[in-house]
Amino acid sequence: MQSRSKLDRFLWSLQQLMKIDAMNLVILVIFVLIGWSLISDNIANPARYLPSPIAVALSSVDMLVKGLLPSYFSDTLLRLIIGSAIGLAAGIPFGLLLGLNRTVADMFHPMLNFFQSVSGIAIFPIVVIWYGNSDTTVLIVILYTSIFPIAFNVLSGVREIPLRYINAARTLGASRFQVMKDVLFPGAMPHIATGSRLSIGFAWRAVIAGEMLAGRQGLGWMIFTGQDSDKTTEIILGMVIIGFTWIILDHYLLRPLEERTIERWGLVQR
């Protein structure tokens, strides 16, 4: 009953937070639209440099009717889901395995930090040399940008677990797998939650950049072809969709999951 009550309180708090965030977002959007319209109405050749919100809205309707916008959006979202899922599925166990040995963990920690700091855009040229302009290239870059942040965060979390907990488990006869499952994994859960949010954020940027540079479909490709054909409305439409999609994913899915995970594992005051 107590856990049920906590869940109910969490869901209620989440609902209130979503209402407040949604209200703030609406107010912000209204101000942005007003400013955007004023600038567009007072510049030369707005159709080329900064189309009005109405022009962008009409462009979105046209692309919806033609079926292009749903196709581009679903392609991008599918790449994000596949790339992030594989990256998390590989990065979390990798970080935990490295954490089984404290010496190995200390050795690999700077290496993971190094690869995490090298952006996916930086490795694009060499991946294009290997695989050309293809979906494989885009997927590899998404994997690269998502796997190292989560592995680094997991390993950082494991390194913060007191050695006495690990030694106590081994003294009681726990196998390496049991130590990883019963000690390292629970102890690193807050870092796993934070790392997952960070990893998916990097993957979202990577999929857009990948589609622009090496893809043939998706929102990134829509922006790239818009620039190529001088269709500024499509470029701005793509930017708006990218921004709002991430706001929805981060504020209404990833952040609540992260906060709930941290609260569940007792690292904040309840």
Language model features: what each stretch is:
Residues 1-30, 253-270:
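Transmembrane alpha-helical segments of polytopic membrane transport and secretion proteins
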Residues 9-18, 41-85:
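Periplasmic/extracellular loop-to-transmembrane helix junction in inner-membrane transport proteins
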Residues 51-61, 65, 204, 214-227:
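Short hydrophobic, aromatic-rich alpha-helical segments embedded in or entering the lipid bilayer
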Residues 82-112:
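Transmembrane-helix boundary motif in ABC transporter permease subunits
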Residues 113-149, 156-157:
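Generic hydrophobic transmembrane alpha-helix motif, especially the helices
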Residues 140, 144, 176-210, 233, ...:
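Transmembrane alpha-helices
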Residues 153-195, 223:
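Short cytoplasmic-facing helical segments at TM-TM junctions of multi-pass membrane proteins
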Residues 219-257:
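Hydrophobic alpha-helical transmembrane segments of polytopic membrane proteins
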